[in-house]
Amino acid sequence: MTSFLDDKQTQSFHQNGYVIVKNFFNDEETKLLQNASKLDPAIRDHLYDRKDSEGLTTKMMAWNHPDDSIYGVTARSEKIVDTMEDLLGGEVYHYHSKITAKEPYEGGAWEWHQDYGYWYNNGCLFPLMATVMIALDKCTKENGCLQVLSGSNNLGRIDHALLES
């Protein structure tokens, strides 16, 4: 098994609950994923609208089985699989894939949540899972990037509740 992370990155993952790896995929690989997200009819035709608590819209698509598309191949790639096995300490499997197409500055948001809270409700009794996020565009606080609560992986499962606006 090839390790794609150094010891400091691995330690950060276990301590903080996440690790950011810039340039994990090279420019050519990233460009292929970007083009597929915009041009592949299998993706474009299956996006659906998801409204946030303020009524703003984010387009998304989710599927459970990695297919032969570039996204399925990426999910099964040595880079992803070996990295996740290294971080989680054993064999891993694909749980689901999701594309979130959020328009910068105006698109909808995801309310604060803990992924394990969703996984638990879907039958995953232990938090022995991880999310891989591949940003295809520049993500900043100004345009609505993913934000995380460092160390929240050590809090146990946090039940989700819908908040009224």
Where is each model-derived feature located?
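Short, conserved beta-strand element in jelly-roll/cupin
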Residues: 113, 121-141
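Double-stranded beta-helix
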Residues: 139-165
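Conserved hydrophobic/aromatic beta-strand scaffold that supports enzyme active sites
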Residues: 2, 18-20, 131-135, 148
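Alpha-helix initiation and capping sites
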Residues: 27, 74, 126, 140-142, ...
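Non-heme Fe(II)-dependent double-stranded beta-helix
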Residues: 1-16, 21-122
